[in-house]
Amino acid sequence: MSGDVAEVPMAGFLCALAAKGPTVDEVTAFAEVMREKAGSVPHEGTVVEIVGTGGDEANTFNISTTSGFIISAAGIPVAKHGNRSVSSKCGAADLIEALGAKLELNGEQNEAVLNKANMCFMFAPVYHQAMKYAGPVRKALGVRTVFNILGPLANPAG
């Protein structure tokens, strides 16, 4: 999370962890560090936090983002969190961007969008800036890693 690990050892670690399967304690520790370093979106009241885990292996559409639109249209505020595709065909950010929305909104801007549109999109690179070190490795590996599990546990809206 600090850029101190070179890409090859990081790739080896992520592959080994994926092969053995992360323990609850390992996932918890990763999530705690991610949340400590993450930006946030202030909001009042309850919001549904929704994020997919990426790479459904069935090459379908982006289900979590579509679910967010439906939930929001039903009157329930949604704080959607996601990224570009890493291990699937279409990441949440790819879909949101294709619809013409701006991705790089800060917490206050997303709070205003949430209040006005009942849904906001928190682009992971804006809120999890430390992930810039793991991003290229994840993309090069092209397989699911522990980071796919961490998205839902590190939502910037709380």
Model regions and ranges:
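Acidic, glycine-rich active-site loops and adjacent beta-strand->loop/helix elements
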Residues: 52-57, 82-88, 127
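Short, flexible micro-motifs
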Residues: 6, 55-58, 94, 145, ...
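A glycine-rich phosphate/pyrophosphate-binding beta-strand-loop-alpha-helix module
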Residues: 14, 61-117
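Electropositive phosphate-/nucleotide-binding environments in soluble metabolic enzymes
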Residues: 4-11, 21-28, 61, 65, ...
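Acidic, glycine/proline-rich low-complexity segments that act as flexible tails and inter-domain linkers
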Residues: 1-59, 70, 78
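Phosphate/diphosphate-binding glycine-rich loops and adjacent basic-rich segments that engage nucleotide
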Residues: 109-158
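Conserved catalytic-core motifs characterized by acidic clusters
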Residues: 48-49, 83-84, 154-155
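General beta-strand structural signal in soluble alpha/beta enzymes
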Residues: 50, 78-82, 103-107, 121-123, ...
